């Protein structure tokens, strides 16, 4: 429904999001067979290039990527590269999967401001390198992923602590005002 409405009313951002979400749901063989059987007419509608079922996920991910690039959303574009990479990985094309992940990291370095996104890309790079039998690159990417996860966890802990301190400060301010009012 979201895809249909976004196409009808020319909302490329939502069209791309819809295509990417459908692509992600079609990546698992069992899910793809069930979704295709249950939604044949809808699948035929989004399958404008008449791709075989096994390649439809990649086609939809590529179309989402093209739309996100045209829209100019760096973070969504990186996510679309990651989705396309997973589609390639699922059909055994590990070199293309790795190239997609490299593009996700290198096309626009602004994504480095989103460590969770970079961490998920590095995690996928580690998986792809492992599938290619490249232990050294797999370990390298896994270590970056783990470092980013640890840093992100520490950042969240610090943010939670700062919020607690801010709350305590507001309580103390209130108590000081109450004491001053009682004294006066």
Q: Model-derived features: where do they sit?
A:
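Phosphate/NTP-binding elements of NTP-utilizing enzymes
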Residues: 48
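Conserved binding/catalytic microenvironments
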Residues: 1, 16, 30
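Hydrophobic positions within repeat-based interaction scaffolds
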Residues: 4, 25-39, 43, 51-58, ...
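N-terminal pre-first-transmembrane soluble regions of secretory-pathway and organelle membrane proteins
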Residues: 1-10
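Alpha-helix N-cap/helix-start positions at coil->helix boundaries
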Residues: 12-13, 74
